[in-house]
Amino acid sequence: MNETILVKIITPLSIAFEKQAKMVTMPGEEGMFGVLPNHAPMIVSLKAGLVQVYIDDIYNPQITYLVSSGVTEVTGSYVNIATETAINVTNLNEAEIATKLLELQKPLSEQH
């Protein structure tokens, strides 16, 4: 039984993040959800929000990305998150993250 799962955050321009983790949480269209190793396969629509990656333990996220809407493919051994935009916000404060999230939630026609 695997103790970690490979998490990839993929944008049209690059692989923004790729690392083994104990757990990942993300913003699905129906609400936040988490994925642990050996999760049942699924494909889920994402909305703009925070993806939190738990590298060392499942209680404190070590890496946080702000993503635009997209899609996630989950298997028992990996999670692929495909999104237009992925911003590492691990070291930003809550106000900065909230500002960036509001920008991502705007319709494309209004974004700079």
Swiss-Prot record:
Primary site of residence: membrane
UniProt-annotated location(s): Cell inner membrane
InterPro entries: ATP_synth_F1_dsu/esu, ATP_synth_F1_dsu/esu_N, ATPsynth_dsu/esu_N
GO CC, alphabetical: plasma membrane; proton-transporting ATP synthase complex
Keywords: ATP synthesis, Cell inner membrane, Cell membrane, CF(1), Hydrogen ion transport, Ion transport, Membrane, Transport
Molecular function terms, GO-annotated: ATP binding; proton-transporting ATP synthase activity, rotational mechanism
NCBIfam families (UniProt xref): ATP_synt_epsi, PRK01474.1
Record's function text: Produces ATP from ADP in the presence of a proton gradient across the membrane.
Stored PANTHER family: ATP SYNTHASE DELTA/EPSILON CHAIN (PTHR13822), ATP SYNTHASE EPSILON CHAIN, CHLOROPLASTIC (PTHR13822:SF10)
Subunit organization: F-type ATPases have 2 components, CF(1) - the catalytic core - and CF(0) - the membrane proton channel. CF(1) has five subunits: alpha(3), beta(3), gamma(1), delta(1), epsilon(1). CF(0) has three main subunits: a, b and c.
Protein known as: ATP synthase epsilon chain
Organism name: Rickettsia felis (strain ATCC VR-1525 / URRWXCal2)
Gene: atpC
